[in-house]
Amino acid sequence: MGDQKRSFINVMIGDFVAVPTKFANFIRGQISEVVKLEVPNGKTYDVQVAKEHNELVLRSGWGAFARDYELKQCDILVFAYSGSSRFKVRIFNPSGCEKELSCVMMNNTPCGHEGSMSYHDNHLQSPSESSSFFNISLPPHSPFQELSGVDSTSLLVSDPPNMQQFCLRCSWTNPKRLAKPSLAIASLSHQHLAFDKTRCMFILKIENDTLKTILKMFAKNVQGLISGVAKLEVPDGKTYDVEISKEHNELVFRSGWEVFAIAYELEQGDILAFGYSGNSHFKVQIFNPSNCEKELSCVVMNRSISDDNHRQSPRRERMNKPSTTCMDCITNHYWLHMDDRERYFFKVMMSVSDIKDELAIPKKFAANVRGKIPEQVRLEVSDDVPSSEDIKDPMSSGGLQKSKKSCYVLPMLYNMTSAQESEVLALEKKIQPQIPLYITAMDKTSVASGSLVFCKDYAVRYLLDQNRTIKLCQSGGSKTWDISLDMDTDDLYALSTGWLDFFRCNLLQEGDICVFEASKSKRGVALTFHPFKESHCPKSSEYTLSTKSPTRRVPKRDYFATNLTNLTDQQERKCFSVKYASKYLPHKDQNMRLRLPETKYKCKAALHIDTSTNLHKLLKGWGKFVNDNKLEIHDICLFQLMKNKKKLTMTVHIIRKGECS
């Protein structure tokens, strides 16, 4: 998304507005010392931007804006940057409904219609200054209910002047005429609102069950105009059908909301701005808890997950869900704003496999710079532009950096208890890790072989980008162990060996939770093991822990195979006979390529040698082979070692159980 689409949200606390740090980094160098604030009625204000305590703050000129639009504590403002130091501003009251903009008038300026008031005594006549009133309903628990002298179910709002009265800046219009075209939040509105259906807006903050409820004030104004199914549209143009039901006199989003929430990864504290544009259609903007507009993901169609990937990092899982960036998103958003004056392009790395020895430059950018760059170019990373994870969020504790989310990669069928999850959170809070904690569990293979798999995304990003030795130590202990990390595997994880002595010294067994803290220094990479008070991880036959969140569990299959297949533990880890393997197979871990006779089918599987038993096992990738070829109990596989091949290759001849005599 280009800078033209950047937005942030601000809740009025105090008498100034501080621009969120993340947003300030996005627009650094793009705005002047004075910015223009534009409200929906078209009026603009010049406001000075000052830098104070490493923050951008709106100062000179802000007071006039705040007075004209009667800003109060806890009012919510949405700032959308439209380029050229210009922001479009929408104002919401604390109950989440968009405020009726005050009628801003010029000092002593005569109105332009016969019968109107000859002069305005004040440059601003707010609704509260009028002498006649009518009632409107308020949502429950509204801050206005605490005001003395105000009825708990109504608020005094000005009655409009006579229809023949209007001023140069704006005029009131007939409420009956407004009822259909504008659907304004309050019963009456200004004339310009009749032609702006998006003015009918409300804001929701996601807090447990409240995120689905449409504000009562808004619901009352659109009652009878919304069908049983609403259409939610996000800025990237995608729409979602969500069922609306009436429960306890409230309108609630039901069926379809979960799909929307998952697609855009809604989390606790996110803020959503809903704009009603008629015909049961809402336009939705999404802001994160730091008040910056979220980068909207787009749905990736026909993208399958590798069947033998039972361990995924949060980033890998997010990529394999319908909620990641795709080439359509790049085409539709990143390239649209480019022209001959622009000198930049974006590349999105979808996975580790995208990191190759070459990088294709987009055709449009290549056309822009054709004939202007030499055959060899220099790549520089700007030191003053931090990554998204390095940017510090403003916090009440003085701007301390938020602790990074841990990486949960648990084997199939292993779940963490709530007590263990709480212990992880307490540990994060205590040690404030610079690199996310890596959390996994001991499974049968790890205990037997003395090996442990690491999510390759995590290993590449935080540990190593090549094969090397890592120092392993226990928190508070002096003893260290050397482990080897194999980054040459073709799967989504990296195999580490040399753990057997560590497992024995720490009395680790199957099902125990392991929490590792990674750190880097000039001497290399180190992993610190943090023991748990209650480390055993319960095993479930029905659920596995989602790698995205420590508290969310999703149903998952026990093994990647067809419904008719029921493999034993031995078959899940294909083992070759010791006699055959010692004579014909290599004696170090490597990948094996599996082929079928007279077909082009190929599959890679990890060959692991258990040095204690000399067993040769096919591990990661074998499950995919079983699933691809629909192997069942009593099927026979004949493995033929292919000679004169640079890489270890075996042809597998499959004899189905019905074919055996």
Swiss-Prot record:
GO cellular component: a single term: nucleus
DNA-binding region: 2-95, 197-290, 437-535, 562-658
Cross-referenced InterPro entries: B3_DNA-bd (IPR003340), DNA-bd_pseudobarrel_sf (IPR015300), REM16-like (IPR044837)
Keywords in alphabetical order: DNA-binding, Nucleus, Repeat, Transcription, Transcription regulation
Disulfide bonds: none
SMART domains referenced in this protein's UniProt entry, alphabetically: B3 (SM01019)
Pfam families: B3 (PF02362)
Record keyword Cell wall biogenesis/degradation present: no
Annotated compartments: Nucleus
Keyword Transcription on entry: yes
Listed GO MF terms: DNA binding
Name of the protein in its database record: B3 domain-containing protein Os12g0591400
Organism: Oryza sativa subsp. japonica (Rice)
